[in-house]
Amino acid sequence: MLLAYTRLSHIHGNIDDSITLDHDTRKKARIKSTTDTGIDIGVFLERGHPLLVGEILKTECGKFIVVKGKAEDVATAIADDWLSFSKICYHLGNRHTSLQIGERWVRFKPDHVLEELAENYGLSINKTPAVFEPESGAYGKSGHNHGHSHSHED
């Protein structure tokens, strides 16, 4: 089993493998999974810093594993104008739900109440599965830990 304790934002070498994870799994500090080529991997990271799509895990044996996002069930609310978009972002933000924000679209986990709210503001809802990469929040860090590592050896 590969063991990864280090995360990097980039490397100047070759990527050895990839791991595809959904948003809820990327939020965990301890992950037991399988790489995309079928190798078992254990990931042990600092709590409170979700893995970001594109980050690279460095294993104890020196392999580099890139993190990919897995498409999952989401609701994407699409606005025709900036005023409707601004209003729905305000109201969804007041509900403290995780949101991914793009140009005149906002994505969240499926929730019929939130979907109806968005429709009431004139937005259309697209339920095509997509990679979910929500904002880190007002007090969150960017999520990028450049080269952070620590030893687990005694």
UniProtKB/Swiss-Prot annotation:
Keywords: Chaperone, Cytoplasm, Nickel. Residues 134-154 are annotated as: Disordered. Pfam families: UreE_C (PF05194), UreE_N (PF02814). Transmembrane segments: none annotated. InterPro entries: UreE, UreE_C_dom, UreE_N, UreE_N_sf. GO terms for cellular component: cytoplasm. It comes from the Bacteria. GO terms for molecular function: nickel cation binding; unfolded protein binding. SMART domains: UreE_N (SM00988). It is found in: Cytoplasm. GO terms for biological process: protein folding; protein-containing complex assembly; urea metabolic process. SUPFAM superfamilies: Urease metallochaperone UreE, C-terminal domain, Urease metallochaperone UreE, N-terminal domain. Its main location: cytoplasm. Residues 143-154 have a biased composition (Basic residues). HAMAP family: UreE. Involved in urease metallocenter assembly. Binds nickel. Probably functions as a nickel donor during metallocenter assembly. This is Urease accessory protein UreE. The lineage of its organism: Bacteria, Pseudomonadati, Pseudomonadota, Gammaproteobacteria, Alteromonadales. The gene is ureE.
